[in-house]
């Protein structure tokens, strides 16, 4: 679980795997010695290693990696599809939040097309859950439910800080 929005050999750097997770997903019946050798190889590259069932891996990555990329691509597309006078101002006034949030939309589109199509079921499941949560926030905004918004924002802020404390972001 490493890298940047850049791709290709020129985007590589020596410490790309240092401290980052590598998830091995051996199919049933895989020789345990082979799994241990692969884990050691990744540890030598600087990674932390975990082993997961492939289906579980797909769900975890759908929400932690694939969905954020999909949303970043979508919001950039939405901003680009605005009326001309708004589009110019979106570009002009795009501040740190928009740039930070959409950085990953600069990622390799061919790779991400393949990721989404090869992980279709897990992505669609997590996208459905996200859509439900987004709809709940939309409803809270529509009905002026400030307490609901604050509760969600406070809870998710604490979760985000935990991710930072775990040095995963």
Question: Where do the protein language model's features map onto the residues?
Answer:
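Rossmann-like NAD(P)(H) cofactor-binding subdomain of soluble oxidoreductases
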Residues: 1-10
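Residue-level detector of flexible, active-site-proximal loop/helix-junction positions
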Residues: 1-2, 56, 108
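Long, positively charged, glycine-interspersed low-complexity recognition regions
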Residues: 158-169
């Amino acid at each position: 679980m490493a890298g940047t929005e850049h791709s290709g050999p020129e985007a590589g750097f020596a410490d790309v795997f240092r401290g980052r997770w590598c998830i091995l997903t051996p199919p049933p019946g895989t020789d345990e010695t082979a799994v241990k050798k692969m884990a050691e190889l990744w540890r030598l590259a600087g990674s932390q290693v975990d082993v997961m069932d492939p289906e579980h891996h797909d769900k975890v990555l759908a929400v932690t990696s694939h969905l954020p990329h999909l949303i970043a691509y979508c919001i950039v597309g939405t901003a680009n599809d605005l009326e001309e006078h708004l589009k110019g101002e979106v570009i002009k006034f795009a501040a740190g939040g928009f740039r930070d949030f959409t950085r990953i939309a600069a990622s390799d589109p061919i790779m991400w097309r393949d990721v989404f199509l090869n992980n279709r079921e897990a992505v669609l499941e997590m996208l459905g859950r996200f859509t439900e949560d987004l709809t709940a926030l939309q409803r809270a905004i529509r009905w002026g439910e400030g307490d609901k918004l604050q509760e969600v924002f406070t809870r998710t802020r604490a979760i985000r800080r935990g991710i930072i404390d775990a040095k995963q972001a």
